[in-house]
Amino acid sequence: MEEWLLIAFDSTQQALRAEMLLEYADIEIDLCPTPKGVTAGCSLSIQFPAEDYTEVQRIIETEQVEIRGIYFKKESEYVRMEK
């Protein structure tokens, strides 16, 4: 089973901007509701394959996308990744 990571945002504008940038980079993403266990100012999150983490991080930093954090799922909860 492929592992997916989750990006949480503080604003819908930043979530939609990230969606556009990641799709343009041909990264497989899924726009989804922010899980209850993740504190964020926006109800939208983006899931992406863990194998694309380095490229996603590069795009976020280069394009100065404001995010709350990137999370991985451990058992039934989400854990924030360190930068």
PLM regions and their residue ranges:
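C-terminal structural segments of small proteins and small subunits
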Residues: 50-83
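Amphipathic, hydrophobic secondary-structure cores in small proteins
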Residues: 6, 12, 16, 21-23, ...
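Short N-terminal helix-initiation segments at or just after the protein's N-terminus
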Residues: 11-15, 19, 66, 81-83
